[in-house]
Amino acid sequence: MPVITLPDGSQRSFEQAVSVMDVALDIGPGLAKATIAGRIDGNLVDACELITQDASLQLITSKDSEGLEIIRHSCAHLLGHAIKQLYPNVKMAIGPTIENGFYYDIDLDESISEDDLVKLEKRMTELARTGYEVVKKTGSWQDAYDAFTERGETYKLAILDENIEKTDTPALYHHQEYIDMCRGPHVPSMRHCHHFKLMKVAGAYWRGDSDNKMLQRIYGTAWADKKQLKAYIVRLAEAEKRDHRKIGKTLDLFHWQEEAPGMVFWHNDGWTIYTELEKFIREKLHEYDYDEVKAPMMMDRSLWEKSGHWDKYADGMFTTTSEKREYAIKPMNCPGHVQIFNQGLKSYRDLPLRIAEFGCCHRNEPSGSLHGLMRVRGFTQDDAHIFCMESQVQAEVKKCIEMVYDVYGSFGFEDVVVKLSTRPDNRIGSDEIWDKAEAGLAQALTDSNIAFEYLPGEGAFYGPKIEFTLMDCLGRAWQCGTVQLDFALPERLGATYVGEDNERYTPVMIHRAILGSLERFIGILIEEFTGKFPTWLSPIQTTIMNITDKQAPYCEKVVKKLKENGFRAKIDLRNEKIGFKIREHTLKRVPYLLVVGDKEMESGEISVRTRSGEDLGKMSVDDFIAKLSDEVKSRQ
C-alpha cells in the first residue's frame, strides 16, 4: 500500500500500485489535465510510471522548467511523426532538445526548403490537434532492434549497437504508427504540444564527425502557451536586428573570409573599438596592481606535455614543425605565465604576484561551430594568473570579484548570474584541499554579497571555479568571466616560492578572465547597444557637416581643434543636402552630429544633435569640447 508524500508535506495512501497520473487524478481532474510527468524520489519519470512503494512525488506541469523541456522533446518526436508521413523514405537520426527548442537530424535524398518547413509545421499542427496519446513501451534490446530493422531506421540501429547495452531495456514511444526511442519522459498526449514553430534547416554531420554523412537538421521552438511563443518570436526578430555580423558589416567594422575561417579581419573602425577596450582594461590592470606581460604565441611540444595540454587538449591545438621540433600555437596563456613566474627565485614576500596578458590564442574549433565574433579560432583573452599562498586565496578571489563587477558595471551590465562549480569525480588533490578551496570561493562570494548557485561536479579536475554570466537586454546569457583555482599546473611546471621558514612551497594559481575574449565581448557589446556604442568607445565620436561650401573652411578649423583635443572626429563637406548627411551619419551611429550654417559660422558656434535625434542647440566649440571630454572621461 504505497504512501505518496507531496511537496507540501501532505500524504495520500493507495491500496495498490498507482501511476503518476493516477495520483494527479486523485487530487483533481484539473491537475490531471495539466500533468505532464512526475518526479519520484527526485527522478524525472513519465506520467504512466507506476509507484509500487512509499515515495515522494512532485507532479510536473508546463509551468515547471522540466515540463517545458519535456514539451520540447515531445515536439521533436512530433516532428519525426510528421516527417515520416510526408517523406516515408526518410531515415531518422537524433532529435534532442536545445535552448528554447529542439531539432531533428534526418537523412533525406531531397533538400528541405522553406516551403517544406511550412508543410511540415502544418502536418505537425494537424497531428497535435487530434490529441493522440503517446504510449510508452519498454522491451528488450532485441525488441527495439527488430522494430527499427523492420522500419529500415539505420541510424537508430547504430545508436542501439554503439550506445545501448544488450542487457538494457530501451523505451519506445509510440506516436500512432510512428515509433521513436528515447530515455524520456514525454508528454502523455499531444494535448500538451500546440505552441511550436519550425525555424530553419541546416547541415550537420552524423555524430558530429566530418568523415560521416552530412544530414539535414531541422530546428524548431516550442513553448507552454501561445503568449510565450509569440514573445519568443518577437525576441528573435529583435535579435536579428541586433546581429553583430550584420551591424559589423553596415558599420564597416570587420569581415571574414573563407581563406581564414574563424579569424577576424579588423577594419579601422572595428580596430578602434578593440584598442579602446584594451586600453580600458589596461587601466583597470594598473588600478588593481597587475603586471602586464607578453608570452610567446608558440612553444615547444615538451612544455605542453608537462602542462597536460598535449594529452588533454591536443585536438584543439594548431601545431607546426621546424628543424625536427614540434611546436603548438598556444590555445591558452597559463603555461607561459608559469614560465615567467619561474624566472628568478620567488619569496613569500613577492606574493601575491598578479600577471596579466592580452594573450593571442588559437583553438582548432570545428568549422560548423564558428559564429561571427562569438565563436572564433583566433582570439585575444584578457587573461591573468595570480600566484599566491593558500592563506591569500580568499582575499585575492574577492579582489577578482570586485574587478569583474567594476568592469561589467562600466558597460551597464547589472544582471550577472554567478555559479560556483565544485569538485568532479575525476580530480586531483585531497578532499581536505577541495573542502578549503570550495569553502574559500563560497565565502568570498558571500562576503561580497553575491548571490550564487552551485554546479556540483562541474569544476575542472585541478580546482573549483566561479563563472560569471551576463544577461543582455534580450535576456540572453553570455558566459564571460571566470575565477578558477588551480593546484595542479604550478606543481607540474615546477613553480615554487620560499616560505618564511626557508622551505620551498608550490603556490596556488588563480586563473582570472573578465571579458573572456575581446572578440566575443565586442560582439556582445554590438548586439547590446545595436552598434550605438557609448561615446568613449565609438569609433567616430562626432562628425561636422556644412550646409554650403561657404562654411567649409570654418568646419575644417573645428574638426582640427577636436582632433587636437584627442577626439575621433570626421568632416563631411560633400555637396549634399544637410538632411541627407544627417540621416547618413545617424545610420552610422555617430554619437554627435555638428551642423554649421552661416549663423553658426558668424557666431563662432556649432549646432549639436545627437544620434537619437535630440537637438542640443547651439554652443561654442569650447563648450562642446568640455561636454565631450566629461563624457569620455567618465565613460558614460
From Swiss-Prot:
NCBIfam families recorded: thrS (TIGR00418)
Assembly information from the UniProt record: Homodimer.
UniProt-annotated stretches for the region Catalytic: 243-534
Catalysed reaction, written as an equation: tRNA(Thr) + L-threonine + ATP = L-threonyl-tRNA(Thr) + AMP + diphosphate + H(+)
Gene3D superfamilies tied to this protein: 3.10.20.30, 3.30.54.20, Anticodon-binding domain, Bira Bifunctional Protein, Domain 2, Threonyl-trna Synthetase, Chain A, domain 2
Keyword RNA-binding among UniProt keywords: yes
Cofactor(s) of this protein: Zn(2+)
Location of the protein in the cell: Cytoplasm
Protein known as: Threonine--tRNA ligase
Residues involved in Zn(2+) binding: 334, 385, 511
Record lineage: Bacteria, Pseudomonadati, Pseudomonadota, Gammaproteobacteria, Alteromonadales
GO biological process, one term: threonyl-tRNA aminoacylation
Alphabetically ordered keywords of this record: Aminoacyl-tRNA synthetase, ATP-binding, Cytoplasm, Ligase, Metal-binding, Nucleotide-binding, Protein biosynthesis, RNA-binding, tRNA-binding, Zinc
Claim: S-adenosyl-L-methionine is one of the keywords in the record: no
Family: Belongs to the class-II aminoacyl-tRNA synthetase family.
Gene Ontology CC entries for this record: cytosol
